[in-house]
């Protein structure tokens, strides 16, 4: 609890915004890149209510939905595109292997399509690697690597001259 709370506190103190109880239904495509997410409130989906979703535009989307890699699956299925994986699609995770799962979680963290980055167990699921046991060092290192890759991507594109301005553009969806 303390570790998670400290991470959330640090992110929001730096300027990140957290949207709780939202579900990502789809992504926004613009100029052949992922440019945002289509979201709805989780209770709306759970109750089967007919409410139009909202779009949140972004300069990067981080797929961290875990074992199911739901965002990557939606992107590949709906848009007939090739992902940055050995098969060009979502391969799916393999059975548990703690040591290999832990190390490949970091190795598989990458940009899988312009504007779409993948981390954590979703990185292993997309790349066809092993799931891991209850060890979270690799998960944290994967998140750190993903953040560094996103910052590098933004820097290479000439976006955000300083980190303070950059932090205003970070949104976290928890569902």
Predicted regions and their residues:
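Residues forming the flavin
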Residues: 1-175
């Amino acid at each position: 609890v303390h570790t998670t709370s400290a991470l959330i506190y640090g992110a929001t103190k730096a300027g990140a915004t957290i949207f709780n109880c939202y579900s990502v239904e789809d992504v926004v495509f613009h100029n052949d890149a992922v440019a945002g997410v289509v979201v709805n409130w989780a209770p709306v989906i759970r109750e089967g209510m007919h409410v139009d979703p909202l779009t949140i535009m972004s300069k990067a989307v981080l797929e961290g939905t875990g074992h199911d890699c739901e965002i990557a699956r939606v992107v590949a299925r709906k848009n007939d595109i090739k992902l940055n994986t050995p098969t060009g699609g979502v391969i799916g995770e393999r059975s548990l292997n703690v040591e290999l799962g832990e190390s490949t979680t970091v190795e598989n963290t990458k940009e899988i399509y312009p504007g779409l980055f993948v981390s954590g167990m979703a990185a292993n699921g997309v790349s066809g690697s092993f799931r891991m046991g209850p060890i979270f060092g690799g998960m944290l290192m994967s998140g750190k690597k993903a953040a560094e890759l996103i910052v590098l991507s933004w820097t290479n594109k000439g976006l955000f001259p300083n980190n303070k301005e950059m932090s205003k553009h970070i949104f976290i969806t928890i569902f």
